[in-house]
Regions:
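GH16 jelly-roll
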Residues: 1-174
Length: 174
């Protein structure tokens, strides 16, 4: 699926007034929250980012919370991107290596921790836009391109022990 091109056209329960971003029950982005499990921009072939967007912390107010890992070129094989999300923190992994943690701020309200309500989970390959184009104009010779996802799995943590992040071993077995 694709997001609407007009940021004010999202299906939401928000009013059209200017105050919509200051209302806790408004489910429009960034109020609703977003966790980018994987963000990749083409001009940084070896870099993968995990990002948490909230009303209190997103690109408009320069308070974005993100982590980055530098790895082998990610466009040559499938990689495992893992997210461990709990009531107090969010951890991101690539191929079993931890590289980002977002800790719930002390005294957090909905503006900095909306992740106890419905929110967006995103896998993102950026071509164009302010970030994806930061390396210069888009080279049209790269098209057509595609993002392939082998699988997405969601597990519920039972709360009795820390979740385990599994790594694939040689041969593709677990």
């Amino acid at each position: 699926w694709m997001l609407p091109s007009d940021p004010f056209r999202y299906a939401s329960n928000c009013s059209d007034g200017e105050r919509w971003q200051g209302v806790a029950n408004c489910d429009a982005w960034p109020n609703s929250g977003e966790i980018d499990i994987m963000e990749h921009v083409g001009y940084q072939m070896n870099h993968v980012h995990a990002t948490v967007h909230t009303k209190a912390g997103y690109w408009v107010n320069w308070e974005q919370r993100k982590g980055r890992i530098v790895a082998a070129p990610v466009d040559q094989s499938f990689n495992d991107y893992s997210l461990v999300w709990g009531p107090e923190r969010i951890d991101a992994y690539m191929n079993g290596t931890h590289y980002f943690r977002y800790q719930k701020p002390i005294g957090a309200d909905w503006t900095s921790w909306p992740f106890d309500h419905p929110f967006y989970l995103v896998l993102n390959v950026a071509i164009g836009g302010a970030w994806g184009r930061a390396g210069g104009p888009i080279d049209n010779s790269i098209f057509p391109v595609r993002m392939e996802i082998e699988h997405v799995r969601v597990y519920r943590h039972d709360g009795n022990r820390p979740p385990e992040v599994q790594q694939k071993v040689a041969g593709g077995s677990w």
